[in-house]
């Protein structure tokens, strides 16, 4: 390499004495150029194919791309996911696998390569699952490895479940310095439900605080998995990556060879392309599919022609055919988002499969809120944006009775909008930011609420997620709210503050177990409404960031709930109404009225701001009127003249108060809605 470097450098001419006039120095013969050396890359033990290298040279990590498209036997296909708690190095490990197998050139490599959205890079989290096809050589045998990267946050566990349904194995990545976290357990249970082969991986062993032996013991004690042969690696430093690839090949079983059966392919993801229509990601379970085949989506019954099929490596690369066990994408000029749903089965129109694949259980939305455009003219744009966004956000599709049917929600304060359901607060924030960034919308989002069961006096039970639609007290018998079981893992020194938090949120203590000498699992059952606010932030704050949580819905229970209305100048503001527990109604009402008093501009008349439960006012503030000095023109004279002017002013203010309307500015709405999220 030094020779090649030297040959490119400018060599200064040797210093000589001045030439005598009239004499010409004979030209020196040009030196012959040294032979150009062949660039060699440091491939780990020659395991990855380099199609450009001669047969006698060792294999290289460089991949020209076409090798990944070559067919391999079904017995040499491995479909796997990477599952982990958030921030345990899952995306970094995926990057190293792509780099080592030559799927992505080193000069093109960047952090979180599979995370395509700006939001994912800014927040350092994975939101959408991504797929990538890799080629790996072991014992001179080529293998096709299909990686499906998954999110780690609890709000996106539905994305994880869809990924696992398309795989036969999973890498369970655990941070060697932090140990087993709450979402680690949840992901393991998902993998076991799908009957996957799980390979434990201890990541970040290069950190000074890493304790791989302790963490391996934790996994054995908590999960019950043998970790004697757990792979110890550092995705950042590239340590142990080859051992992981070997384990994928040797431990994860291949898919079943059902290529001669009728086509059945499971759709596990999709997105909308403005030029090509709906792009479908699928896993071929039975049979095969070719470019130009006439296909049918079994749930919708719609038929299309497969204009383009290919693999994700990780960019889209066209192929002519995909067989059973392979993962790829499909484009068929699909313009209707309803025709290609996640979980649907693709089959041939001429030779249809007898039954569809099981698909996925629908995600249950946990949090509801209203989305309103600040500019009323953007209402139709918001409708179109939600239609496109719901295609590749499977959780949004589960909301069939609310906004995803696009039934408009109207508010006297904020105009027309939609009511949407989300899996959690982070999911809600991500959807809002995607709508604003990708579709250039300016939105107001109302305070989050949950779905309540209202038992009416006539014996009927109705669901209500919008406080403004809650039946009147005389028509309802009781209200039931959803409860969740929450499992918090925390170091033992923070058990006290964690239990205080559970008690403050109307939680019921269930059990506490020491999973290791220094870490405990604290289990509470509490209302979902108490958790959708700042519960997670408080959990991190009280544990100095060391605690984690995982929750699941356990059912509905009757509670003493009331509807809290906010009235401004006697008029209720529907957008600020909320459902709260009676014990918290006063504190919430007081906080909202004080905040509104700070934000609403003063008027020419006195404006009362009241928090009410039915007809009863429980908290009140008032904006004093702007006073005009009507006596300024009276320099003297009879007192009756002054009294007449003051009386006339008082009558005018009384009339203005009776017919006047107070406009709440958008800034006040946004500030109060943010406050509601904090105090509820």
From Swiss-Prot:
PROSITE patterns reported in the protein's UniProt record: G_TR_1, G_TR_2
InterPro entries for this protein: EF-4, EFG_III/V, EFG_V-like, EFTu-like_2, G_TR_CS, GUFP, LepA_C_sf, LepA_CTD
Annotated EC: 3.6.5.-
Gene Ontology CC entries for this record: chloroplast
Catalytic activity as recorded in UniProt: GTP + H2O = GDP + phosphate + H(+)
Residue ranges, compositional bias (Pro residues): 28-37
Gene3D superfamilies: 3.30.70.240, Elongation factor 4, C-terminal domain (3.30.70.2570), Elongation Factor G (Translational Gtpase), domain 3 (3.30.70.870), P-loop containing nucleotide triphosphate hydrolases (3.40.50.300), Translation factors (2.40.30.10)
Binding sites annotated in the UniProt record for GTP: 84-91, 149-153, 203-206
Gene Ontology MF, one: GTP binding
UniProt feature, compositional bias: Low complexity: 38-60
Signal sequence, start to end: none
Domain tr-type G: 75-256
GO biological-process terms attached to the record: positive regulation of translation; translation
The protein's role, per its UniProt record: Promotes chloroplast protein synthesis. May act as a fidelity factor of the translation reaction, by catalyzing a one-codon backward translocation of tRNAs on improperly translocated ribosomes.
Matches recorded under NCBIfam families: lepA (TIGR01393), small_GTP (TIGR00231)
Similarity section: Belongs to the TRAFAC class translation factor GTPase superfamily. Classic translation factor GTPase family. LepA subfamily.
PANTHER family given in the database record: TRANSLATION FACTOR GUF1 HOMOLOG, CHLOROPLASTIC, TRANSLATION FACTOR GUF1-RELATED
Name under which the protein is recorded: Translation factor GUF1 homolog, chloroplastic
